[in-house]
Amino acid sequence: MKLKTFLASTTLALASLASTGTQAAGTLTVALHQDPGNWDPIATFLVSWGAVGGQVFDGLIMRTPDMKLVPGLATKWEFLDKNSKLRFTLRPNVKFHNGEPFDAEAVKFTFDRLLGEEGKKGPQQSNYNSIEKVVVVNPTTVDFVLKSPDPVLLTKLAGYGAMIVPPKYIKEKGSQFFGMNPVGTGPFKFTEYKPKVSVSFERNAAYWGDAPKLDQLVYRFISEPATQAAELRAGRLDVANQIPLAMIETLKKDSKLSVISVDGPVALALRYNTQRGIMKDREVRKALTMAVDRDAIIKTILLGHAKPIASFQGALSFGNDPALKPLPYNPAQAKAMLQKAGVKPGTQIQLDFRGPDSNFREVAQAVAGYLQAVGVTVSLKPYETNVLLNDIIPNGKTGEMWQNQWGGWTFDYDNTAYAMYYTKQRWNPFDDDAKLNALLHMQRNTWDQVARKSTLQEISRYVADQALEMPLYSLNTIYGLNKRAKNLALPSDGRFRFVDATVD
């Protein structure tokens, strides 16, 4: 399903749920599978943060549910001096939730912080390293001075690390306090955070845009998809962002509920630890990939709510190469390749995965079964999600394989590939490949989108040839909904914006 088709069908589906009378307000309750643990925009990389961040923060640029870039805290922008400078005209008379003014100094503070020592502590800085500095022209005008081309910069300014933060508040309270008590310019104001339980917001009646219609917005952190489904059926949720695939048809039969499944940007793979044991051998890595029937996994476990991938990106990603095909499922050839490489039957490897993800647990079990059939014994190692993402992977403490899952929120392979394959990036604890580094630099340093797409496709082919990962699938974005919630904007990237939502 193409993105435009998804938007049209989603609009029709949601419109059919909407009442024709005066819309109510009330409280919208949303389940998220993960608590990011910190609400500071520069401290995160998680889709679950993006699902919340757009309620409390704004960027200079915003992205609509149909992925169009529109003015946010900036009313307009233009490239100057042969694309070496990006000038923003800022929206006047905007205030942060604590009352301090939004102006050019706030923009400069935000990016000085992101690009400075504070930004080094989090995963966002590398997304914005094309920016040399931000210069205040006047209170409503700023210039971004660029040290290199960045053809994805405008998109990246519409999310995550580029969200504008309040200088005075952070200077007075400190970054740690800010991370637990966020203040922005967004449509909802933070009221309470209970770690691993919930985060709550109230309506920002003074919002510079259309004021939200809801009185309250509550996110509950529910890691188990089955629990999300149970809470949805019990009427204690309005939106569930993860439900067991096996329960989709059951939920659809409930007259109070609906389920929407659309193409999404989330890609899943098993990344290989190329410095450990048998994984040092590229032919072994290829053999293991060929030993797993991904089509069968998609059909029997994911019930068709995913598509096979040949590289770590979905079909909606700029840079995806339709001509690149996954290695075929061929267990006999895989077994022969392992034997030729000297891998002894019964060789043991470890697969690390996100323990609370019951859907992927089944996938991991299936992978273990396929590898067992070619003589490789897999030990499944579940981790608390934040432990795996914040400690085990970035510190190079993984087993031979680990669950690699990426939201791909820019819908551009650049963001994914740089984070995954460039030397010493957070998600690349093991590999140091000069050719990959050069290709990644090349595509980031041109405004020529045709040339850039060609380079990105070359990167995906090279990664496949080196067998750095076992590409699995691109997962559909699936929402379970209570029909009492109306006018929901449900983008495929999971970054909610509930300005128009109401609850009967």
Question: What is the meaning of each model-derived region?
Answer:
Residues 188, 307-340, 357-362:
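Structural transition elements
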Residues 337, 479-504:
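Long beta-strand-rich cores associated with HINT superfamily self-processing modules
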Residues 30, 99, 239, 369-421, ...:
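Periplasmic binding protein-like
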Residues 78, 89, 125-169:
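Surface-exposed binding/hinge segments that line
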Residues 68, 158-212, 216, 226, ...:
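Gly/Pro-rich hinge or "lid" segments in bacterial periplasmic/extracellular proteins
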Residues 31-81, 112, 183-184, 480:
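N-terminal lobe/hinge region of extracytoplasmic solute-binding protein
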Residues 283, 377-388, 415-483, 504:
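Extracytoplasmic/peripheral linker and loop segments enriched in polar/acidic and small residues
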Residues 204-250:
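Ligand-site clamp/hinge motif
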